[in-house]
UniProtKB/Swiss-Prot annotation:
Predominant place of localization: cytoplasm
Posttranslational modification: Methylated by PrmC. Methylation increases the termination efficiency of RF2.
Protein role: Peptide chain release factor 2 directs the termination of translation in response to the peptide chain termination codons UGA and UAA.
GO molecular function terms noted in the UniProt entry: translation release factor activity, codon specific
The protein's name in its UniProt record: Peptide chain release factor 2
Localization annotation: Cytoplasm
Annotated organism of origin: Mycolicibacterium gilvum (strain PYR-GCK) (Mycobacterium gilvum (strain PYR-GCK))
Listed InterPro entries: PCRF, Pep_chain_release_fac_I, Pep_chain_release_fac_I_sf, PrfB
GO cellular component terms, semicolon-separated: cytoplasm
Domain of life of the native organism: Bacteria
Length: 372
């Protein structure tokens, strides 16, 4: 094997060893054994919430271990591929070298993707994520754009086998949605998706314009960590006003004959949360309270960050402006305005292929932290 290829394999081995140490492979195996033991308890399903968490945690732990073990196995096999390629080249064939080089390139890409996991070391990065999407300027096109974004994130979660729980969807009159709130139930979902927070811009020929004019639409994405009991977000009962109403679907049609939808208003802050996707008023109230707790936790974090920025004499960083542009006409390109990462296949991106954007965003964010 030539020195360049040997050097590449050695560098990948160093990176993967770091990943294995951060992931704690031995600890992960022990956790899987414990979760398997918990899952085999016949009384587990007496508590459905706990049972769902145990089975979800077990699935994600098994998937993470499998990813690391597969990468290690492929890396260990790579020198053998090159040895076989050298033998075949002596017999007059160079195809085997091309195949080995292709595997080296793919392995480099896959290990880099797994390496991003080691960069998720923030206080809440391990948490599940709450995602809020709101249509912005652009009328019916903006509402349609908000729904397209919702589908993009749900497709991303589905591709990774991450369960999604939709808490609330407020439909627009003509098409699309005014807003939506959903949870992605997976370890590190918040760490990954938090870089998606900001304003997303769509440029396309409007399907709602009878003159087929180009339209620019905006939608805002907010990503929050799911609150845990250790966060101590206590909300006095008197601080919350509870309103109930009937759930509605697309075009304002009623989808429930009872007042099962719930709107919570946090009186001290004015934060409003709605939930209508559960069948009962009680379930909707519980879900809405979880979202309200997450919003209050984020508010607390932002206040603490503002205080630190003031002490440092720093204006702070803003995530609220345009962070990504999706152009479908006159050319096709999705470009992140912070990282410069871009993809010329918007259809794939809108179908959930956003890992490249997430990885670039996480690296960009960590570099900003290092520079401060």
């Amino acid at each position: 094997m030539d020195p360049d290829r040997q050097s590449d394999i050695a560098a990948l081995d160093t990176t993967l060893t770091t990943v294995e140490r951060v992931v704690n492979v031995d600890g992960l195996r022990g956790r899987i054994q414990q979760l398997e033991s918990d899952a085999s308890d016949p009384k587990l399903w007496d508590d459905q919430a706990r049972a769902q968490k145990v089975t979800s945690d077990l699935s994600h732990a098994q998937n993470e271990l499998r990813r690391v073990e597969e990468l290690r196995s492929r890396l260990d096999d790579l020198p053998v591929l090159y040895e076989l390629a050298a033998e075949e080249e002596g017999a007059g064939s160079s195809e085997a070298f091309a195949e080995a080089d292709a595997e080296l390139a793919k392995l480099r890409e896959d290990i880099a993707g797994m390496e991003v996991r080691t960069l998720l070391s923030g206080e809440y990065d391990e948490r599940e994520a709450l995602v809020n999407i709101r249509s912005g300027a652009g009328g019916v096109d903006a509402a349609d754009w908000a729904e397209m974004l919702m589908r993009m994130y749900i497709r991303w979660a589905e591709q990774h086998d991450y369960p999604v729980e939709v808490f609330d969807t407020s439909y627009a009159e003509e098409a699309g949605i005014k807003s939506a709130t959903f949870a992605v139930h997976a370890p590190y979902a918040y760490g990954n998706l938090s870089v998606e927070q900001g304003t997303h811009r769509l440029v396309r020929i409007s399907p709602f314009d009878n003159q087929s004019r180009r339209q620019t639409s905006f939608a805002d994405v907010e990503v929050l960590p799911v609150v845990e009991t250790t966060d101590h977000i206590d909300i006095p009962e008197g601080d919350v006003r509870v309103d109930v109403y009937r759930s509605s679907g697309p075009g304002g049609q009623s989808v429930n004959t009872t007042d099962s939808a719930v709107r919570l208003t946090h009186i001290p802050t004015g934060i409003v949360v709605t939930c209508q996707n559960e069948k009962s008023q009680l379930q909707n109230k519980v879900s809405a309270m979880r979202v309200l707790q997450a919003k209050l936790l984020e508010r607390k974090r932002l206040e603490e960050r503002a205080e630190m920025d003031a002490l440092k004499g720093d204006g702070g960083s803003s995530w609220g402006n345009q962070m990504r542009s999706y152009v479908l006409h006159p050319y096709q390109m999705v470009k992140d305005l912070r990282t410069e990462y871009e993809v010329g296949n918007p259809a794939a991106v809108l179908d959930g292929d956003i890992d490249g954007f997430l990885e670039a965003g996480i690296r960009w964010r960590n570099q900003k932290v290092d520079d401060e």
